[in-house]
Amino acid sequence: MYKTKCLREKLVLFLKIFFPILIYQFANYSASFVDTAMTGQYNTMDLAGVSMATSIWNPFFTFLTGIVSALVPIIGHHLGRGKKEEVASDFYQFIYLALGLSVVLLGMVLFLAPTILNHIGLEAAVAAVAVRYLWFLSIGIIPLLLFSVIRSLLDSLGLTKLSMYLMLLLLPLNSGFNYLLIYGAFGVPELGGAGAGLGTSLAYWVLLGISVLVLFKQEKLKALHLEKRILLNMDKIKEGVRLGLPIGGTVFAEVAVFSVVGLIMAKFSSLIIASHQSAMNFSSLMYAFPMSISSAMAIVVSYEVGAKRFDDAKTYIGLGRWTALIFAAFTLTFLYIFRGNVASLYGNDPKFIDLTARFLTYSLFFQLADTFAAPLQGILRGYKDTVIPFYLGLLGYWGVAIPVATLFDSLTDFGAYSYWIGLIISLIVSGALYRWRLTVIMKRFESLAKSKR
């Protein structure tokens, strides 16, 4: 990160940060995409099992990665104030925090998840695949969270290309392990859909090993003196949790409501479950665009706010939101035209393809709502405003999605589509609430700047 002098320099810097994050996010979401697509080609029953498992896994995992992502605004403010010597200390505190959170998530997966899966009315074969998938996936919990901390460090330093290169390794690693374990290639035991969980875990262990080597060999990071081990500092841990808990809670509130809808789908047929999950999976892949804008906004805004250049932060906000709209125009057009082709990536049954394509039509409205709401979350994190957005997200997602969806399901014949309608409306409401909060925060900082002149 560096100070910019004009709009053109800001645009160039923003895009330099954004594009590597975008590629990183695509690579990140590709792990789930590869698991779902390869399992769908194996058979629909295993796909239904994996979809139920990810409905439980995603909320808890994203909650914890949301907590450790608080490292980005913390380091951003240090850099904006010229306190680079504080970076290494905060990095190690978040490493310790990630290890502790790994134990929490492991306990949830091993003890809580099977109980949920066995009490939601799933077919026995589907439940068996889901439980085995989660157990295998739990092997990769530690590298998943530790890599999230390393990635947050690199992003906050503006080294988003390095994050991108590391994450690009995930796709071939995950695909290779999945091929071996799902289909039982080259004499490896055939594990079916559950093998996708083990494939992802092994891929992340390899990725973590490579990332640690890069961390201590990269010239640009040597000035941080990361080789010096720093002891646990409970004050900094508490600060990280205080800032990160609302971030994780906001992400959890959004992802969990999608997952609850996925679990509600258990009352429908295996075909509907598989089609719903496939459409939702591709929607998540497309979410990489607004999510990347959000991450880039958190980096640039936190840097400018830390340096007390509030007008520059405001300029970046405009650039980010316009970038989100431009990309949305392309992704919406692509998905509308090729929704049938996209559906065929997940299976070859004509009924499955037709049903998935219908769900994908609803996902167009997801993308439109996310284009508005997601960047606002990143902007608010850049201002270190996380507590109120958490409550707003809770209200927007849980106060709207499930009640509206249940109402549509009861009063209309929309069936499974009712729950997509509820989710779309909740995203729109949440976006409006975030926009209101940003207006309040920006006025507060403008008043602060005027009072110090």
From Swiss-Prot:
Organism superkingdom: Bacteria
Keywords of the record, alphabetical order, are: Antiport, Cell membrane, Ion transport, Membrane, Transmembrane, Transmembrane helix, Transport
This protein's membrane topology, according to the annotation, is:
Multi-pass membrane protein
Q: What's a BP term from Gene Ontology annotated to this protein?
A: monoatomic ion transport
Provide any one GO MF term from the record.
antiporter activity
Query: Which residue ranges run through the membrane?
Result: 12-34, 54-76, 96-118, 128-150, 162-184, 194-216, 243-265, 285-307, 319-338, 358-380, 387-406, 416-438
Major localization listed first in the record, in broad terms: membrane
User: Looking at the keywords, is Glycoprotein present?
Assistant: no
Would the keyword Lyase turn up in this protein's UniProt record? no
Query: Where in the cell is the protein located?
Result: Cell membrane
What the protein does comes down to: Multidrug efflux pump.
Q: Which family does it belong to?
A: Belongs to the multi antimicrobial extrusion (MATE) (TC 2.A.66.1) family.
**Can you say what this protein is called?**
Probable multidrug resistance protein NorM
